[in-house]
Regions:
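Structural motif corresponding to the early beta-alpha repeats
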Residues: 30-134, 181
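Surface-exposed cleft-lining segments at the edges of enzyme active sites
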Residues: 123-131, 146-151, 220
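Residues at the starts of beta-strands that form the adenosine-phosphate
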Residues: 2, 26, 61, 150, ...
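Short, well-ordered beta-to-alpha junction loops that form the rim of enzyme active sites
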Residues: 103-108, 137, 154-157, 249-251
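Histidine-acidic metal/acid-base catalytic patches
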Residues: 2-4, 9-20, 53-58, 73-76, ...
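Extended, basic/helix-rich recognition subdomains
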Residues: 150-159, 163
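N-terminal basic, low-complexity leaders that serve as flexible interaction/assembly modules and, when applicable
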Residues: 1-38, 42-44
Length: 271
């Protein structure tokens, strides 16, 4: 288990400074930070390689990338141009040697502002729109398979992800383990048991306090406080042989990246 940070700056020097301040040398880099994305709406493999080389010269390793978040329209088949650009970006990542991408495929469907018991998302398996969602996954997974890119799907719903895996089978169709799954009523400590370590391509570290059932009633707090036992989460990954990156995020008021990194490193070292 290695600790890294998210990076979204277009300035390699700034990213290197952020890494030094945090005490890490690995990042998951936003595709939007790569030169050319803003102009074209997608990245090329050459631009990914070049930016990665620039970061490497500054002692920073790009361990993975963060894919653009698709709109609801793109997922449901209503924006082919956006979907095509997303696929170009995924292909470029793999061609450039990126091993994994943090991917938020269904964020456009999450009820961020409303609470519907038993319905964390606007479209659930078997409902209208679900067939389109599966077609979307087939499309992006086929691209990932072509270039051997691991899709670390950021999906909190355990059973929903299993349904997607059953419909779109691929060793590259995996998951980001994020304790935010607690917001969906899932157990944030049992991801290894529920998904299998071979499917976990990337990890977040975050903690929350639940004040009520809706999304807005979960409070973000530093890693060493809250309802989630982060030590247990890290221990389960280490014991299962996870050989990847964990990135702290959503640290709440008073939380800092450098403190979170130090805390995670201490846990990894058995402290």
């Amino acid at each position: 288990v290695r600790v890294g940070i998210h990076a979204g700056s277009r300035d390699a020097g700034q990213i290197a400074d952020q890494c030094r301040q945090a005490g890490v040398d690995e990042v998951f880099l936003s595709a939007r930070a790569v030169p050319g994305f803003a102009e074209r709406g997608y990245v090329s493999s050459d631009s990914v390689r070049a930016f990665g080389d620039t970061l490497a010269e500054r002692g920073v390793r790009v361990s993975g990338m963060i894919a653009p978040v698709p709109s609801k329209e793109a997922v449901l088949g209503g924006d082919e141009a956006e979907l095509a650009d997303l696929c170009k970006t995924l292909k470029a990542m793999g061609e450039a040697g990126i091993e994994a991408t943090l991917f938020y495929p269904l964020d456009g469907f999450i009820y961020f502002q409303e609470y519907h018991p038993g319905r964390p998302m606007e479209v659930m398996p078997g409902e209208e729109g679900w067939d389109e969602i599966i077609r979307f996954f087939r499309r992006v997974v086929s691209v990932a398979d072509e270039v051997n890119l691991k899709l670390a799907n950021h999906l909190w719903a355990v059973d929903m992800l299993h349904t997607i895996w059953d419909a779109v089978e691929s060793p590259n169709n995996g998951v980001t383990y994020c304790q935010g799954m607690y917001i969906f009523g899932e157990d944030p400590h049992t991801a290894v048991e529920n998904w299998g370590i071979e499917r976990i391509f990337f990890c977040h570290a975050r903690n929350l306090v639940r004040h009520g059932p809706s999304f807005q009633e979960y409070e973000e707090v530093p890693l060493d406080s809250g309802d989630v036992d982060i030590a247990r989460c890290v221990r389960s990954l280490a014991e299962a042989g996870y050989d990847g990156v964990i990135v702290p995020e959503h640290l709440g008021e008073g939380g800092s990246i450098s403190d979170a990194v130090a805390y995670l490193k201490k846990l990894i070292d058995g402290g």
